[in-house]
């Protein structure tokens, strides 16, 4: 047990990211043109590099338009067990990436189901979320953290 875990019950940064990496679904949040939050369930991130997460979506989607207009974003992961609920919300910014190098790196076999023209489909893009802070809920306790 780490020294910080002995002093409090909060999750370490490693434990937070291990938890996030084990989830199959992510909820992403954007801000619409009227300033209201919009939440959408998505498949888990395709890739994570530290506090940076990569998702795929349609370039023509409402969400892409919202992120281009206002990059403030959040992502949420949760696990509901029989007796225990754990949730992690991350706040940061979302960038819309359309460069071919990133699209090819994130592309997976089977993606043509969503993007008919393949990796060069103009309606395929990558969302890059950069987390700056967050909140963690576990064992009836909520704690904020900075990344």
Describe these PLM feature segments.
Residues 42-43:
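Conserved beta-strand in the GNAT
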Residues 2-27:
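Active-site-proximal "nucleotidyltransferase
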Residues 27, 52-54, 135:
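General beta-strand recognition
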Residues 2-8, 88-147:
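Charged, gly/pro-rich active-site loop segments
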Residues 22-24, 49-51, 69-73, 84-92, ...:
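A generic structural signal for short beta-strands and their flanking turns/coil linkers
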Residues 19-33, 73-77:
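A short, Trp-centered hydrophobic/proline-enriched beta-strand micro-motif
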Residues 46-83:
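A short mixed-secondary-structure module that forms the rim of ligand-binding clefts
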């Amino acid at each position: 047990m780490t020294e910080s875990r002995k002093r409090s019950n909060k999750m370490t940064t490693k434990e937070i990211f291990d938890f996030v990496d084990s989830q199959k679904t992510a909820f992403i949040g954007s801000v619409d043109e009227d300033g209201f939050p919009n939440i959408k369930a998505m498949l888990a991130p395709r890739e994570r590099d530290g506090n940076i997460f990569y998702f795929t979506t349609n370039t023509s989607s409402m969400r892409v338009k919202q992120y281009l207009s206002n990059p403030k974003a959040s992502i949420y992961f949760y696990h509901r067990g029989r007796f225990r609920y754990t949730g992690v919300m991350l706040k940061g910014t979302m960038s819309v990436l359309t460069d071919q190098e990133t699209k090819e790196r994130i592309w997976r076999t089977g993606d043509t189901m969503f993007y008919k023209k393949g990796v060069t489909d103009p309606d395929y893009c990558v969302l890059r979320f950069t987390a700056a802070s967050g909140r963690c809920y576990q064992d009836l306790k909520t704690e904020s953290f900075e990344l």
